[in-house]
Amino acid sequence: MTTETGPDSEVKKAQEETPQQPEAAAAVTTPVTPAGHSHPETNSNEKHLTQQDTRPAEQSLDMDDKDYSEADGLSERTTPSKAQKSPQKIAKKFKSAICRVTLLDASEYECEVEKHGRGQVLFDLVCEHLNLLEKDYFGLTFCDADSQKNWLDPSKEIKKQIRSSPWNFAFTVKFYPPDPAQLTEDITRYYLCLQLRADIITGRLPCSFVTHALLGSYAVQAELGDYDAEEHVGNYVSELRFAPNQTRELEERIMELHKTYRGMTPGEAEIHFLENAKKLSMYGVDLHHAKDSEGIDIMLGVCANGLLIYRDRLRINRFAWPKILKISYKRSNFYIKIRPGEYEQFESTIGFKLPNHRSAKRLWKVCIEHHTFFRLVSPEPPPKGFLVMGSKFRYSGRTQAQTRQASALIDRPAPFFERSSSKRYTMSRSLDGAEFSRPASVSENHDAGPEGDKREDDAESGGRRSEAEEGEVRTPTKIKELKPEQETTPRHKQEFLDKPEDVLLKHQASINELKRTLKEPNSKLIHRDRDWDRERRLPSSPASPSPKGTPEKASERAGLREGSEEKVKPPRPRAPESDMGDEDQDQERDAVFLKDNHLAIERKCSSITVSSTSSLEAEVDFTVIGDYHGGAFEDFSRSLPELDRDKSDSETEGLVFAQDLKGPSSQEDESGGLEDSPDRGACSTPEMPQFESVKAETMTVSSLAIRKKIEPEAMLQSRVSAADSTQVDGGTPMVKDFMTTPPCITTETISTTMENSLKSGKGAAAMIPGPQTVATEIRSLSPIIGKDVLTSTYGATAETLSTSTTTHVTKTVKGGFSETRIEKRIIITGDEDVDQDQALALAIKEAKLQHPDMLVTKAVVYRETDPSPEERDKKPQES
């Protein structure tokens, strides 16, 4: 390399300075040219040109794209006077590129952008075309050579980000708002609804059948308006897409719900749509393929709350943003440094293997952007300095806090936009047999793995809260429609209407679910109801439970709270006893009182939002429901004078209700494995060892006995029988019944079980089965609270069926984070045929309702027709 001196160098300096000034002037006159672009590249490129004049041919390849003043510098060595013509040549050489953007309604928008324009220029043009002001939740995506989705960086030149010749982009939601109700404008919610509908159809957002129907009905109401019998004839929703695997049954359910939304505006329908969609477990989760340290395929999901880890479509861990100290990547490895826990001294680093370096960087960028947008008040400035280790990338847009402040300042009339009859997701797109898909620039290839498989498993493992949403996704309109079907006293009606709105929605959803089941002609519940009625009419069973205590609701929904008691209130005229009406009224009053106390607990619980894996303590205790206070239990004692007299030796001050998170059926049977309750509690204590395995095995006392449980969220109904002062009727046991043929109940007493599982797991009351005709009460002093705990067993006698349940809970702790696996084995034996499909469905539904934050990953059914040797030996003895 040579250094030039003398007058020639001065001429060159003049040549270098003169082209820069016109170029800067051209940048000002062209609105899409980014400011400050010409200086760094011009200086560096010109340095190469002045020092290496022997390579003009090599440099000429980049002239069109990088700097157009360089050619002038070469031609002006002998004739500097020609420099005056260079500005005209520069203005002509500035080229523009055609950008095609696929919008959320599948339409295309074309615009012309200067070739050196930054991503923000194109994004602003698209938002202006859409008349969108709350644009910080959205972004533009493009596909690279590997067909991977990438976010367009608004602070960098488009030309440096997209290498392919056609500039195709997709306008999508980048940050899903945790509470869509906080969006200011209807048009913003409309585009968010379009994005969620695309997510549902492509399988990225799994839903249950009930959720598909509900969200689909709101989408129809928003686009078609009120149901019109003349206009909407036949299957008028068959042309629209609502689910990956759409069935005729789903379309009929959507039309049935659509008819009930008369008077609901499109904006209100979209709000209801978003309020239900945000509860889905995969809402706003951006998935990326990865492998853990052992080489097992996993998925890393980034959302507003943190980083989620999925394996085999099951979420196995969650790292909340406050728990993460540092996010980094090196080559194809992605690392997160975890804040030490309460009992740890050092930080721990967890590494994941990504497919390649680009994937690791892409995931790192997504994490940086989500953390900055949702957690920080203002974006962090990029690091400054000549030598900076690592990437300088930082999120440069507005944070959610800044977006809300800006949205509050929006002062314009609501923009007009047309919700056209949906041509976006129509069945005609799949007439060729291919499944519907958005354009290639929109499809998210890095997250299509497990979610594609989830479409087949929606009924079982579509989402951790999909079943729980069935009790939350109804609207007041539906309540008005079905309210005349409920026969209640005026006093009870007023109490019911005083409940909060969420309780009303849960109540209505429970009734709707139960009604659909009871309408089936082959429903086992109808036969069971008849058996209970027959037992009630028998004179030999004066203390048999009334229809309100039947297990028909228990076998249908464990989430059925006060709604189950409402459903079966109509009196049965077949009862011959003259005093049955008085007993029903007493039962009703007691049940109403107990229901009110329980609802207070549920309202208290609904405000507890604890992450199951954000820390060790949170995961262990995230299912604590609440507790009764002394006043509530005193009223409970007054409503049960017989029990109050029996407990005179020690006054019970409080009763703690807790849901045992570790064993979904360890609470279920009280006949065996009862001494394991301290072990079961130890599994819930924060001071747990690194690995614990808890096994609670319960066996029946005889082939005639079936032990059942009452879950903590069950609505308790109790009454005192005049025939026996120690007999207490069990109310509505909210468990799934694993028998398909209803047993004929012959016992005279069903005792109520209230299992106490304290938050720390210590001092749980032991359950000792007493005689089947007498309720056995046990009091155990809690070392934590210092209160007596009232417990009793619940026994029922069947004729020919017996059930054995084995629960195996494995909890592995690694680095302060735990992984819980629950295996449950249910054996049903008896002479009568058992409908294994019914039993399996009930078992899965019970497991989901007990553990809404966990997924059912595997269900295996074995059927043996021959009876076991023990049963052969027992049958002669029973006869």
From Swiss-Prot:
The modification Phosphothreonine is found at residues 30, 79, 475, 550, 685. Residues 38-50, 444-501, 514-538, 550-577 have a biased composition (Basic and acidic residues). Highest expression in brain, also present in kidney, olfactory epithelium, retina, sensory ganglia, gastrointestinal tract (only enteric neurons) and lung. The modification Phosphotyrosine is found at residue 343. It holds the Pfam family FERM_C. Residues 483-541 are annotated as: Spectrin--actin-binding. Residues 76-87 have a biased composition (Polar residues). One of its GO terms (molecular function) is structural molecule activity. One of its GO terms (cellular component) is postsynaptic density. Residues 97-378 form the FERM domain. Residues 1-88, 428-501, 514-594, 657-696 are annotated as: Disordered. Residues 381-482 are annotated as: Hydrophilic. It is found in: Cytoplasm, Cytoskeleton. Residues 17-35 have a biased composition (Low complexity). Residues 743-879 are annotated as: C-terminal (CTD). Gene3D superfamilies: 1.20.80.10, Phosphatidylinositol 3-kinase Catalytic Subunit, Chain A, domain 1, Pleckstrin-homology domain (PH domain)/Phosphotyrosine-binding domain (PTB). Keywords: Actin-binding, Cytoplasm, Cytoskeleton, Phosphoprotein. InterPro entries: Band_4.1_C, Band_41_domain, Ez/rad/moesin-like, FA, FERM/acyl-CoA-bd_prot_sf, FERM_2, FERM_central, FERM_CS. GO terms for biological process: cortical actin cytoskeleton organization; regulation of exocytic insertion of neurotransmitter receptor to postsynaptic membrane. SMART domains: B41 (SM00295), FA (SM01195), FERM_C (SM01196). The modification Phosphoserine is found at residues 75, 378, 430, 437, 461, 466, 510, 540-541, 544, 546, 564, 578, 639, 648, 650, 665-666, 671, 677, 684, 721, 782, 868. Its main location: cytoplasm. Interacts with AGAP2. This is Band 4.1-like protein 1. The gene is Epb41l1.
